[in-house]
């Protein structure tokens, strides 16, 4: 059954249209330079995600937002997300890498859903998201569907 779900998720990623991919890549290009803002929005939306990062666990989010460590880690996360966006629709390798690094950390489906919600909230506040919402929905459904099938 898990194999069937995984196959359907791969099909979903492959089913993204060229217009959807272009829309997602274009809208993300406008914000990917604000890695700190993106990670801040995600941590603010779900503090349990921040707690998974030992260097940030238990610290006041507003006080660490301007630190070099926070910036470096935000750039790493957003850089990987940029790679995924750039690789669309061929993201199987990215998903495998993501799952391999996040499963041992005990990341839950709920936390990933909350990461998604925080990211979407950020996008709504910083882009013309209404025009890209359907494309983002399809893209995030495909990515997280593949991740959940492998976790």
Swiss-Prot record:
Residues 1-15 form the signal peptide. Disulfide bonds: none annotated. Keywords: Heme, Iron, Metal-binding, Oxygen transport, Signal, Transport. InterPro entries: Erythrocruorin (IPR002336), Globin (IPR000971), Globin-like_sf (IPR009050), Globin/Proto (IPR012292), Mb-like_M (IPR044399). Gene3D superfamilies: Globins. One of its GO terms (molecular function) is oxygen carrier activity. SUPFAM superfamilies: Globin-like. GO terms for cellular component: extracellular region; hemoglobin complex. Heme b binds at residue 102. Residues 16-151 form the Globin domain. Belongs to the globin family. Monomer. There are at least 12 different components in Midge globin. This is Globin CTT-IV. It comes from Chironomus thummi thummi.
């Amino acid at each position: 059954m898990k194999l069937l779900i995984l196959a359907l998720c791969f099909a979903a990623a492959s089913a993204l249209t060229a217009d959807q991919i272009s829309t997602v890549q274009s809208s993300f290009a406008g914000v990917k330079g604000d890695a700190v803002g993106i990670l801040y929005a995600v941590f603010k939306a779900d503090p349990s995600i921040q707690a998974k990062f030992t260097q940030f666990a238990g610290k006041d989010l507003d006080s660490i937002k301007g630190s070099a460590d926070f910036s470096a880690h935000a750039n790493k996360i957003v850089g990987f997300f940029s790679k995924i966006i750039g690789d669309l629709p061929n993201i199987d390798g990215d998903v495998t890498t993501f799952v391999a690094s996040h499963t041992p950390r005990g990341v839950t489906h709920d936390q990933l859903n909350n990461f998604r919600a925080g990211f979407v909230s950020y996008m709504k506040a910083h882009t013309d998201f209404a025009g890209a919402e359907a494309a983002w929905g399809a893209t995030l459904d495909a990515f997280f569907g593949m991740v959940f099938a492998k976790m």
